[in-house]
Swiss-Prot record:
This is SsrA-binding protein. One of its GO terms (cellular component) is cytosol. NCBIfam families: PRK05422.1, smpB. Keywords: Cytoplasm, RNA-binding. The keyword Disulfide bond does not apply. Belongs to the SmpB family. One of its GO terms (molecular function) is RNA binding. The gene is smpB. It comes from Synechococcus sp. (strain CC9605).
Length: 166
């Protein structure tokens, strides 16, 4: 019986390792009000995959555009792989194609064109052997909105701390 339990625990640990966060854009949640999210695939070359798995991706300045009916990821820095020569390495800031269904792309295109919203990369995560990018439809926050959100967050934190004390 102990052997079966060990196998289940090892399998659960393997699943947890296979579904992990690789990069997060925390600044985006502060600067934008995220209205809707979408999980997309991302078209990468081999050295980009190795760099992302090593945690060498920066989503902070990134944004997404819809051009020619395709979602494109711009200005996301993925560091060159250290063990590949210059010839086989990738351009760190190249434009990458995002993989999503046509209906989802058309829906986001209508929202971005109509309301003046923007598409922002929120996180890169590993799902099994696939690297997925979560993008968000965001509306820019003004300074007073950021302050109000920070105040609300602090009050929730204070209430939670008070509840734990009693």
């Amino acid at each position: 019986m102990a052997k079966g339990g060990a196998k289940k625990a090892a399998a659960a640990a393997a699943r947890a390792a296979a579904n992990r966060m690789l990069a997060d854009n925390r600044q985006a949640r502060h600067q934008y009000e995220i209205l809707e999210t979408l999980e997309t695939g991302i078209e990468l070359v081999g050295t980009e995959v190795k760099s992302i798995r090593n945690g060498k991706a920066n989503l902070r300045d990134g944004f997404c555009l819809i051009r020619n009916g395709e979602l494109q990821l711009h200005n996301v820095h993925i560091s060159p792989h250290t063990h590949a020569g210059n010839y086989f390495n990738h351009d760190p800031l190249r434009t990458r194609k995002l993989l999503a269904h046509r209906r989802e792309i058309d829906k986001f295109r209508g929202l971005v064109d109509q309301k003046g919203l923007t598409l922002i990369p929120l996180s890169l995560q590993l799902k099994g052997s696939w690297i997925k990018l979560t993008i968000g439809l965001g509306k820019g926050r003004k300074l007073h909105d950021k302050r109000a959100a920070e105040k609300e967050k602090q009050s929730k934190k204070d209430v939670k701390a008070a509840m734990e004390r009693y």
